[in-house]
Structure formats: C-alpha cells, structure tokens
Amino acid sequence: MRSFRRTASSLSLVVLLAFSTALARRAFPQTNSQSSDTILIINAQLADGTGAPLREGALRIRGNRIVSAGKLSPTSGERVLDAHGLVLAPGFIDIHNHSLQGLDSDPLAETQIAQGITTAVQGPDGESPWPIANWIAARRKNPAALNVAVFAGHATIREQVMGKDFKRVATQPEIEKMAQLTWQAMNEGAIGLSSGLEYEVGSYSNTAELVATARAAAEHGGFYSTHIRDEADKAFEALLEEIEIADQAHIPIDHSHIKLGTVGVWGKAYEYIRVISEARERGLDFLADCYPYEAWHSNIKVIVPDKQYENSKSVEKALADMGGADHLTITAFKPNPSYEHHSLAELAKSNKLSPVEMYIRIIREGDAANTEAGVIGHSMIESDIKAFYQQPWVMVASDGGIGVEHPRGAGTFPRVLGRFVREKHWLSLPDAIRKMTSLPAQRLNWPDRGVLKEGAIADLVMFDPATVLDRSTFVNPQQLAVGIEKVFVNGQLVWNSGKPTGARPGVVITR
C-alpha cells in the first residue's frame, strides 16, 4: 500500500485510503486488506500451451513469474482473482509483427493486447532497425505494454553494404561484409535473420548470399525467418531454395506467412506440405507461420515477379494470376489518396482505362513520388489455409501490427479462436493455443515463455471461448476484438475488461 504524508486533516487521509483500497479491490478481490505481489487466479480453465487438454484449476504468480498451477487455495495476504470459468492461457506470441513505428506512437499497443498478444517480434521480411543495439536501447527507455524482440533484416544489412547500388548480385567481399554485420546484429541482441525475397532489395540476392548471412545467424543460435522469393507460380521453386539455404547454413526455419497466392497454385497446399514434410522427416528444423485471411497486404509491385512493372503483358498475366483486377484494392497512396479503398477494377472504370493501364499509371505516379501504393490482394483460397493450419508445425502469426491497414493487425488471434476453433472446428482449442504460445516459443528458444508451468514468465491471457472473436474488417481494420478479458505481461495487468490499464511492463527479449 502506498504511504501518504500526514496531513492536517486525518479525515481526508482516511477517505483517500479507502478510495484507493476500493479501486484495488475492484481489479483484484482480496482475501484481506494486506498488499502483496502474489496473485492467485482461481476457477480457471487452464490451457498450459502444450496442446494438452484444458483442466480446471488455479494459477499463482509472484512478481513476473508463475509460482504454481493446479488445485490451489488462497493464502493470507495474496490478491485473488476469480476467472469464473474462463480460459487462462500463456500470452500469445506473434512471431511476425510489423509495429516498429506503431510502438513509438502507441506504446499501449491497444490493438495488439486486445487480441491477447503479449510478445511481438519485430523486423520480419528483411527490414529491421539499424543498428540493432540502438533500437534495443531506445525501446528499453520507452517500454511498451507488451514485450518485443527483433530480427536482423537481410535487406537492411544488404543496403548497409551496397547502398543504393543493390540491383545486382553482390560480390564475395560484399557478402563477407554482410555476414560480419549479421554477426554484429546477433551480438547486439537480434533473435535471428529475416529476409523478404519478393521485395526489391532482397530480390537481387542469390542463394550463396543468403546462405552466408543465415550461417552467421545460426552460429549465434538464431533462426531464419523468410518471406520466400515467390508465393505464386514459382512457389515450389522458392520453397526448394529455402530448404537449400537451411541445409547449407544449418539453421532452423520459420517460413513466413505460408500461402499459395495465385490461381495457378490454388488447391496445391497438400503438395506443398508434402515437400516440407519430407524435409522435416530427414531432420530439417522447419516451422511456418500463417495468418487466417484469404487476402494479403503489401505493395503494388509484388504482384509482378519479373519486375517489368510497365510491361503490359507482364501486368496482364499478374492480374489474371490474382483472379482479376477486382481482387486488388489500394489501401494507401500518398500521391493520389482518392485511389484509396478502391479496387483496381473500379479505378480503371472511373478513369476510362483498362486495368493494365491503370496499374501502370499507379506505378508511374508512385515512382515519380518515390513511393509505392499499398495494396490488399484477395488471392488465396480457404481450403489451402485450412490445410496449412492443420499441420502441427504451423504457428499463428499476424503479419500485422499497430496501425496496419489490414484486419489481421487487430484480429488474427481471436479470429483463429472464434472462427477456426469454435465455428469451423478446424482445430481443437488446446491445439490452437499451442500454435500461439509454446510453438513460437520453441522456435524462439524461449523455454520460460509460452507455457503455464512453475518458473515460467507470467505472460497470460484470459478469454471467453464462447465469445472471443475478431471484429476488424477491410473497411474498419482497427476495430478491436472481443472476448479477451484480461492480459498480463510479466505479471502486470495490461488489459482489463475491454480497456488498457495504462501499465507498460514490456521488456526487450534478446537472444
């Protein structure tokens, strides 16, 4: 209990103390009026994160650690919180999150903690802060409501070495310098290497460059998270390159946002899974993450893999592969905001152009302003998503983040729990929770997170399995999820009954 200076009015002191005690009791009903750093959560359905069946019980936390779980009774002085039969699980770990800028503007991370995320890994797809040490120091000075970790981005490192002269294969001395910088980033606290090989900077790298940088990360105990070179017609070829990199670098894999993103590969999920399963059976440490939507969010150039953005035939094929121009929607375009929230087909019609001509116009307008249009592409099918999610080696991850103009930024984890578990019965509840907790913790080599066990970090989420659901949409992507009742980060309550508490106990987790 906070102490107060003696004032002239003892009555004022009594009133103030009574008021503060009442507030504390509203958040945590107590067995007595004594304060304590121990919290007992009773009457919970405990999901331990391993995939084991849920069990009724209680969980005791002291400070930032879980002390015990099971059949427990209150002890004198500890705060008691009644879960009233709700599920209590480890906090969700988002292994692919884009909140680098959002954490500065919104450290309470409301869209993230409202869906149960307690740790968000930054710097995926090859783009990370630099230097890593500076970013970590800044985050520690300005903590968020959730924990963060960070990749060393391959494209970021490539630009450090090659500058703007990156549109070519790197020389051997340049590759060696990239490996050295990867070493530096890992020494400074990065948890692995990420790459984005569909994006411009990373797309010019060859396999040898990626092996060299991945090997440097592996030597420091890191893993390789990759947005592979193609998720469309050449998805199988790109997958084989990923496997080759992992084999040569001796590094564990996280295949980012596994998908089959064009008409030509729709329905081939089980063929794709077979290639991965064969690699896993011979010993490759291969996991993947997946978001629960049939639409992706990126820049407008990624749909043309040969980079011939003003070639009519290349653009025509790209749009056909997506299923048509009505499947591509502009989300952000600074040179002409009037394009935003319209499909390419709608824009073409209103401007009396063909979809190909409209695409090329947007490319030219963007290049003139040194920017690119943000787009959402509706180019996956549900049966492929289902097949991927039902694999035991696939994790849940958002590929979203604070302020992202895609519903996955605010809805990913509740969407899986509400739609894929409760409504569609694709997954059992324990298995879905495992994909959000202990499986990403395994990839990150964090044995004290992602599980409910004695000694583990008290990152926790309490939710109602009957009501948890995403509410974010493509029209309103920031709408908060429902059904997440309470979230604890490092033992502190950060989300309570639909509102942030204002606490910011998040830490930076380093390798």
Where in the sequence are the language-model features?
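Polyanionic/metal-chelating signatures
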Residues: A133-R140, A155-T171, K177-L181, L197, ...
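Divalent-metal coordination cores built from histidine and acidic residues
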Residues: A83-L88, F92-S99, D104-S195, A214, ...
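Divalent metal-binding pocket/active-site signature
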Residues: Q184, E188-E242
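N-terminal secretory signal peptides that target proteins for export/translocation
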Residues: M1-R6
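Active-site microenvironment of metallo-dependent hydrolases
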Residues: F19-G57, R62-G63, L72, I113, ...
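Short, small-residue-enriched loops and turns at beta-alpha junctions
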Residues: Y199-Y204, D230-A235, G261-G264, E294, ...
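Bacterial N-terminal signal peptides
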Residues: S9-A22
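Structural recognition of the beta-strand scaffold that forms the well-ordered cores
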Residues: D94, T119-Q122, N147-V150, S225, ...
